[in-house]
UniProtKB/Swiss-Prot annotation:
It comes from Salmonella newport (strain SL254). Belongs to the UPF0441 family. Residues 204-223 have a biased composition (Polar residues). NCBIfam families: PRK11653.1. InterPro entries: Biofilm_formation_YgiB (IPR009576). This is UPF0441 protein YgiB. Residues 178-223 are annotated as: Disordered. Residues 178-195 have a biased composition (Low complexity).
């Protein structure tokens, strides 16, 4: 009889443990679900300039202008920089490059090198910008400059890309799309000049990574 009692006690302990671990497992699941929500994508709109934004958002002209001007400043800080106009044009096409402000993020030694060779350094024009809500649920808007190449030989040809080379599809303003929240985070300042074709290589690598990630996600969802 004592043995039977011992067996019953063991069974009871197992049953008790199972019942009391279940809420813990549920709590862990809830934490992961919340973490997933925090990393969720957000909807952004793509505009060429402040006028496009204002036309699509009546009554938000001031916000559109502020976002556009902030995107221009961000473009000066983070856009790829080239030592010569020719290098920039080879990447982005004729009429798509401008002289970059001397204070736009480039390290002093690189500024001196570029200025010695051509009198200045060069960057692509901002082709458009993404606009979305501020991270953290603020009342204002976040923005991210976009660039595009007019050179058919470039991987960035006809596409909107950010300063890191990530591709956001066709360079057509007025679109709305869903992007990761990290897409709207500030990019690091450009501190070195890019060699000819270097930005295009970054775009090609980013596109390959995006396709690979999309394929992995599809396979995971399909089991």
């Amino acid at each position: 009889m004592k043995r039977t009692k011992s067996i019953h006690h063991a069974s009871f302990r197992k049953s008790w443990s199972a019942r009391h671990l279940t809420p813990v497992a549920l709590a862990v699941t809830a934490v992961f679900m919340l973490a997933g929500c925090e990393k969720s994508d957000e909807t952004v709109s793509l505009y060429q300039n402040a006028d496009d934004c204002s036309a699509a958002n009546p009554g938000k002209s001031a916000e559109c202008t502020t976002a556009y001007n902030n995107a221009l400043k961000e473009a000066e800080r983070t856009a790829p920089k080239y030592a010569t106009r020719e290098d920039c044009v080879a990447e982005f096409g004729e009429g798509q490059c401008q002289q970059a402000p001397a204070q736009a993020g480039l390290a002093p030694e690189n500024q001196a090198q570029a200025q010695q060779s051509s009198g200045s350094f060069w960057m692509p024009l901002m082709a458009g910008y993404m606009m979305g809500r501020l991270m953290g649920g603020g009342a204002g808007f976040a923005q991210q400059p976009l660039f595009s190449s007019k050179n058919p030989a470039s991987p960035a040809y006809g596409k909107y890309t950010d300063a890191a080379g990530k591709n956001y599809g066709a360079a057509q303003p007025g679109r709305t799309m869903t992007v990761p929240k990290t897409a709207m985070a500030p990019k690091p300042a450009t501190t070195t000049t890019v060699t000819r074709g270097g930005f295009g290589e970054s775009v090609a690598k980013q596109s390959t990574m995006q396709r690979s990630a999309a394929g992995t996600s599809t396979r995971s969802m399909g089991g």
